[in-house]
């Protein structure tokens, strides 16, 4: 045989030591606090605070765009709601909001199908503080 003896890997059962950075609770977190809201009525802005909106497609239908006088609005998929485009733009848009000088980033949810599952996981991790 060209290969050596087969060795079975042991499963790491340690919850405290993640195997990869992506397993950290806040691995995807920007410096600016991020809050993921499931619906517009969950947003209660504080007076004097500057908010940036991470919008899925900028649609008024979602109810987030017209909800507040946002300091900055960044769209993942401008106008069309395509998950593939949103996934490509995800980290760029998150970084733009993080560097915009807002006090807090408010993220509206993304459809949890296909690529949306991964984006929602990243948004949930980014909202951990």
Predicted features along the sequence, with ranges:
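Short catalytic/ligand-gating loop segments at beta-alpha or beta-beta junctions
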Residues: 10-20
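Internal gly/pro-rich beta-alpha loop/helix module
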Residues: 1-8
């Amino acid at each position: 045989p060209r290969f050596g003896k087969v060795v079975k890997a042991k499963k790491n059962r340690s919850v405290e030591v993640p195997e990869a950075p992506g397993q950290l609770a806040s691995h995807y977190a920007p410096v600016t606090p991020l809050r993921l809201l499931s619906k517009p009525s969950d947003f209660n802005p504080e007076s004097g605070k500057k908010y940036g909106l991470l919008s899925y497609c900028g649609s008024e239908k979602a109810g987030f765009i017209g909800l507040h006088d946002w300091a900055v609005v960044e769209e993942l998929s401008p106008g069309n709601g395509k998950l593939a485009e949103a996934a490509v733009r995800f980290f760029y848009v998150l970084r733009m909001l993080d560097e915009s000088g807002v006090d807090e980033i408010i993220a509206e949810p993304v459809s949890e199908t296909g690529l949306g599952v991964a984006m929602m996981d990243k948004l949930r991790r980014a909202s951990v503080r």
